[in-house]
Structures are given as structure tokens and as C-alpha cells.
Amino acid sequence: MAVSKKLVPLAALVWASYAMAQDEACKAPDTTAAILRCEELRLRHAEQALNAAYRRLAGELQQRGSEAHEREARALLVKAQRNWVAFREQDCKALFTARGDGSLRPWYYLNCMRSHAQLRTKQLETFRSD
């Protein structure tokens, strides 16, 4: 048990160092591969924020789920999120396909996915604040 308690801060430190190095490298990426890695990192951050916002909202609706309308609201949220995931995927695939060939073509897909994730995060947070 004592060993694992010591490893947690070490792992956090290693991860923080890695994240800082990635952020620094993304300030001025100079190759296509670096540009794509940076956009993947930005997408990962946006996805984490989106998932956290969704879990918070779904959890709040679950906790308040004593009334029929609250249970229905949670069920509708789950359905809406599944539909949104499918919409986002198709929308970004369409953009990717429309770009034809090119080394930065994947960037358009990643950027589209990130933009949608950021917008959806704001929508979920607004849902919670209303």
C-alpha cells in the first residue's frame, strides 16, 4: 500500500511534465506530423471536458430522479447524446471527404471533432445552469 501511495504523485509529475512538453511543442509545430499530434492533443482535452460535463449533468439528473419527468429527462439526455455522437462523426467525415487529398486532410477531421466537442460541452453546461 505504501508503494502505491508513493507512485501516484510520481505518475502525476511524469504526466504533468509530458503534458507541458506537448503544450510547448504545440506552440509552433513545424511539420505535418507535429501539427496532427497537436490537434490530437487538443481533441483529447476537448473530449475530456465534454465527458466530464456529460457525466456531471447525467449524474445530477440521476440524483434528482425521484420524479418521473427527471427520469425521463435523463433518458432523453442519453438518447440525445448518442444521436449527437453519430451526427458529429458523420459531419466530420463529410468534411474530411470533401477535402480530397492532402497531408493536412486529417487535421480538418480532428479540428471538426474538437470544435463539435467544445460546442457540445458548452451546451451541456448551459443545460445545467438553466
Give the location of each predicted region.
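N-terminal alpha-helical modules
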Residues: 3, 20-130
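Sequence termini and other peripheral, non-core segments
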Residues: 12-14
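N-terminal signal peptide c-region/cleavage motif recognized by signal peptidases
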Residues: 16-18
